[in-house]
Amino acid sequence: MENHKDDAVLLKHGWCEMLKGGVIMDVKSVEQAKIAEEAGAIGVMVLENIPSELRNKEGVARSVDPSKVEEIKKCVSINVLAKVRIGHFVEAQILEELKIDMIDESEVLTIADEMHHIDKHKFKTPFVCGCTNLGEALRRISEGASMIRTKGEAGTGNIIEAIKHIRTVNNEIKYLCSLSDSEVYHFAKKINAPIDLVLLTKKLKRLPVVNFAAGGVATPADAAMCMQLGMDGVFVGSGIFESENPRKMAASIVSAVSNFNNPKILLDVSMNLGKAMCGSTRVSDKWKNKNEEHTKFLTPQ
């Protein structure tokens, strides 16, 4: 692993620090991107289909058409992000050539490489990756991820998986901080994570990069709950544009993230939103056991 204090790494991490306290919304069109910007989102994630649609479609889910990203970049002044398939470094190269603000190496799309994640150190563009536990988060960081997010259960409008992943990481960090120095080395081996990042996490008492919630956030209350559990910000997918009133829902979630510890404001922004996305309690077979990351995903390529 490259030295985490390398200037390029610090630059990417520093950029992500500026996103703290913000909301990033999934969008499919210029119109949706403008709604997100007007609502106060700090960024938009450009997709061909939002996660709820991807769950119900057969076939391969790939990275977005670059022309759509380019079109949206011209129409909004906030950050523009897009997803690539796990391991698909060429999709990432294409997005970097577009000068996109951030790349999400995402399990929401069809996996491209079962043996490797992308070596994110090779890119100037910062990456965000999903995790379900501390070991997974630190492995992604060792590969060059500048931001971590929960995997959650995208497209369901059901927050249960995201909360599980948040609490898992929090509890593992709490346990790590209780260990003696000699015990830390055994713990690092047990979770298959680089010892330098494990030691840094213990020192900081948190992940060494920005950490957002994602996967199933559908209401202002969901977003505020994630923030109260220690998240730095929130990704919202289908919860905005599958709701009855996307403009109002978007603005309310942004306000909830900014005021997550103020019940009075949370009450106010939760009133008269119209119907939230219908949602689903079904966990997809593809990710039913994703709390135990596939052992193949250990090294970048």
Curated annotation (Swiss-Prot):
SUPFAM superfamilies listed in its UniProt record: Ribulose-phoshate binding barrel
InterPro entries in UniProt: Aldolase_TIM (IPR013785), PdxS/SNZ (IPR001852), PdxS/SNZ_N (IPR033755), RibuloseP-bd_barrel (IPR011060)
Keyword Cytoplasm recorded: yes
Function as written in the Swiss-Prot or TrEMBL entry: Catalyzes the formation of pyridoxal 5'-phosphate from ribose 5-phosphate (RBP), glyceraldehyde 3-phosphate (G3P) and ammonia. The ammonia is provided by Pdx2. Can also use ribulose 5-phosphate and dihydroxyacetone phosphate as substrates, resulting from enzyme-catalyzed isomerization of RBP and G3P, respectively.
Gene coding for it: pdx1
Record organism: Plasmodium falciparum (isolate 3D7)
Name of the top EC class for this enzyme: lyase
Transmembrane segments: none
Enzyme Commission number(s) of this protein: 4.3.3.6
Protein name: Pyridoxal 5'-phosphate synthase subunit Pdx1
Binding positions (D-glyceraldehyde 3-phosphate): 167
UniProt-reported outcome of changing residue 88 to A: No activity. No complexes formed
